[in-house]
Amino acid sequence: MTSPYLVRTSSISWRQGLSALLLAAATAGMTLTAHAEPTLYVAGVGGSTEQMYKTRVIPAFEKAHGVKVVYVSGNSTETLAKLQAQKGRQQINVAMMDDGPMYQALQLGFCEKLTDAPVYQDLYPLARLSPEATAVGMVATGIGYNEEAFKKRGWAAPTSWTDLEDPKYRQLLGMPPITNTYGLHSLIEMARLNGGGEKDIDPGFAVFEKKIAPNVLAWVSAPGEMDGMMQNGDVVMAVYGSGRAVALQNTGFPLKFIYPKEGAVALQVAACSVTPNAQSELSQQFIQYVLSPEIQKIQSESNGFAPVNRTVKLPPELAARMPYGQEKVDSLLKVDWDTINQKRSEWTTRWNRTIER
């Protein structure tokens, strides 16, 4: 006969053992949670920019801060759409976009105020978009052309925005649509050169419809696709950003980038710390890190982003390929994003109906 004492003892021992196991498991879980590295979600454009960030920018930040950085690839309008879809429950911590969509994000209240840091004192005044957003790189919108193709045809290099109208380029011109910032800049410049501007865009549409559209082989939004058409010889000239031009030149392709005599247009790559933000402090630190001279120089070398940090020193050959230095930055044309963003949807509808059809 089994002793009642033994039964009670066995039962107590079993319960104590189970409790000990549960406590150990819970403690282990708490330890893992306490030591799990945080994750920072950084949204930015794809292609060469994404590869540069993943290989040359992010790893050092991860190591220094004990954080896992996930790069969320998408063009600027896609990133803005994600912020709108996730309003109030943002999954993105740091958003990097072209300045136009960034101004929209600011108007919609998606960015928190940037915390003070010494690096902000080193930036060009143009780089501070607002108390909540800063440029982290700068490019110029101008014209890129295949130097070898021009030489074979005996053509002089383009010098002006009006060269886009020349009928000798019929079906040899690549053009971004106005959903792309380069294309939008082109429309505004054609309006300005014909008596209009952001507040009177009609002259720009007229020039595109009558003179530029017949020259366009394809309306190309993706930078990689435009590069491919240039490399294949399908087009010999296109509206380009100086950063994209550097990326293509780095492959050995004979692309020349020119600043039109009327002026190239400033395009800034901007960043902000998204709100609400579970990793606010890390987000602010990441933006400051990207503005450091070391990372600014990496962006210039790899992707043609001109530094917005005035203390960065570039070798002359590299500096010549981008809007580098106070004089060059001051020469860039600016656009009125407040007016553009109010009208952009209307312009896009009109563009699809009358130009890109």
Language-model features, listed with the residues they occupy:
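A ligand-binding cleft/hinge motif common to bilobed small-molecule-binding domains
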Residues: G100-Q104, Q231, V236-P254
